[in-house]
């Protein structure tokens, strides 16, 4: 499945409105959602299977979210998402809102 400027194993839109959306992602080993930020929306990640790696720049952090865990990223915070386990797929629910969605890619 091809996203704004990346490819991952699958993305399923669960619900989408003018200012909120819910999507179910599956990332295979090596799948990466590149560095980006959102102008208005907050991202909430909920790990459902495998492990999810969440990297941020300000503050610089590298977190591994396990099954049952969650992580919040505020608007304008640069972040990169990847599969945290080369041995199995990572599945996560992403809730985004409240505000207009955008995907602003930034340099690696």
What is each stretch, according to the model?
Residues 24, 44, 60-62:
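Short, surface-exposed secondary-structure edge patches
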Residues 1-24, 34-35, 71-72, 103-108:
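A short, N-terminal "cap"/entry segment at the start of jelly-roll beta-barrel domains
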Residues 44, 72, 87-104:
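A short hydrophobic beta-strand segment most commonly corresponding to one strand
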Residues 18-19, 40, 59, 86-88:
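Short strand-connecting beta-turns/loops that link adjacent beta-strands
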Residues 27, 38-54, 95-97:
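Short, conserved beta-strand element in jelly-roll/cupin
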Residues 33, 42, 71, 79, ...:
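Glycine-centered loop/turn positions within well-structured domains
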Residues 59-76:
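Short acidic-glycine-tyrosine-enriched beta hairpin
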């Amino acid at each position: 499945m091809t996203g704004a400027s990346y490819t991952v194993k699958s993305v399923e839109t669960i619900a989408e409105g003018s200012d909120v959306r819910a999507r179910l992602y599956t990332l295979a080993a090596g799948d990466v959602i590149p560095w980006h930020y959102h102008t208005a929306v907050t991202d909430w990640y909920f790990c459902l299977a495998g492990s999810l790696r969440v990297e941020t720049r300000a503050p610089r952090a590298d977190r591994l979210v396990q099954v049952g865990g969650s992580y919040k990223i505020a608007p304008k915070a640069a972040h990169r998402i990847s599969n945290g386990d080369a041995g199995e797929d990572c599945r996560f629910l992403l809730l985004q809102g409240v505000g207009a969605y955008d995907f602003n890619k930034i340099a690696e």
